[in-house]
Amino acid sequence: KIDGYPVDNWNCKRICWYNNKYCYDLCKGLKADSGYCWGWTLSCYCEGLPDNARIKRGGRCN
């Protein structure tokens, strides 16, 4: 399992504006163990994602 910021089809992090429930539901939908809104980046962060999940690994948001 991996941890990280899930991305959309354009390699952009999911913005959350401190909404932990949104991120938790998003991450659970991606089969993660849990998730929360990381306030420093205002982006969802998932813990325990499947190894093949799409997470931010660098590169620009298109």
UniProtKB/Swiss-Prot annotation:
Entry's localization field: Secreted
Cystine pairs: 12-61, 16-37, 23-44, 27-46
Gene Ontology CC entries for this record: extracellular region
GO biological process: defense response
Gene Ontology molecular function: calcium channel regulator activity; sodium channel inhibitor activity; toxin activity
CDD domains noted in UniProt: neurotoxins_LC_scorpion
Free-text domain note: Has the structural arrangement of an alpha-helix connected to antiparallel beta-sheets by disulfide bonds (CS-alpha/beta).
Protein name: Kurtoxin-like I
